[in-house]
């Protein structure tokens, strides 16, 4: 049991920490002299995300055996994104470019905690012996990718003062992902379909993450800074 917990932590929280380093290193010291966000605020929201992700996962376990149900998938997609919106939609974050990173922080916290909980819980269920650690790892990584990206999307909405427009965008992506990954848990699902849905959900999470973090982020930072009447010449490409 203790070994399972350690492995689950490495899979879930480890993926979150690695992704955090890869994304943020270009936006903070020493890559730039003036970081694009406050470390205390970021890690405070990351901690809030860990707590929220843990609470959501505890609720998720009550529906074990129905994880494949469409209504459950949609409901939890909404809960995930509402948690991010409620935390970020405070006046102190409105119209500020660093809110993008705080959205990323709470999202990656939620994703990391949920991935850890899922890996540990699933590994302890006798009825799921075929679920390998490799499968847990893939689900953990895509969970972290998805929630960090949708968190940044909601952060963009708060920064642009259009929170509900971007919340809806994040919700659509989250619902699509949950509907795909839920099919992995259909009773007596064929192995071929399990891997097909796993690949599709991974491609969705990875594609959306790449779009938000690598394609859009520099441009969005410039636009929000312009809204604030500011500019920077050190925005990473």
Question: What name fits each language-model region?
Answer:
Residues 1-237:
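Hydrophobic alpha-helical segments at protein termini of multi-pass membrane proteins
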């Amino acid at each position: 049991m203790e070994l399972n917990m350690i492995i689950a932590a490495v899979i879930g929280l480890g993926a979150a920490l690695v992704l955090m380093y890869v994304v943020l290193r270009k936006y903070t010291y020493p890559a730039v002299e003036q970081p694009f966000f406050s470390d205390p605020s970021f890690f405070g929201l990351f901690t809030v995300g860990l707590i929220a992700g843990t609470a959501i996962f505890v609720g998720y376990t009550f529906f074990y055996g129905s994880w494949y149900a469409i209504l459950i998938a949609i409901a939890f997609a909404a809960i995930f994104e509402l948690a991010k919106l409620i935390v970020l939609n405070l006046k102190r974050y409105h119209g500020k470019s660093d809110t993008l990173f705080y959205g990323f922080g709470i999202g990656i916290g939620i994703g990391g905690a949920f991935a850890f909980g899922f890996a540990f819980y699933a590994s302890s269920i006798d009825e799921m012996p075929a679920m390998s650690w490799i499968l847990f790892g893939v689900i953990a990584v895509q969970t972290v990718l998805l929630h960090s990206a949708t968190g940044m999307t909601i952060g963009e909405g708060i920064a642009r003062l259009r929170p509900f427009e971007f919340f809806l965008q994040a919700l659509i992506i989250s619902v699509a992902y949950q509907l795909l990954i839920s099919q992995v848990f259909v009773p007596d699902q064929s192995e071929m379909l399990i891997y097909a849905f796993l690949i599709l959900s991974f491609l969705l999470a990875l594609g959306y993450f790449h779009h938000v973090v690598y394609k859009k982020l520099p441009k969005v930072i410039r636009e929000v800074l312009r809204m604030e009447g500011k500019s920077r010449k050190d925005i990473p490409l």
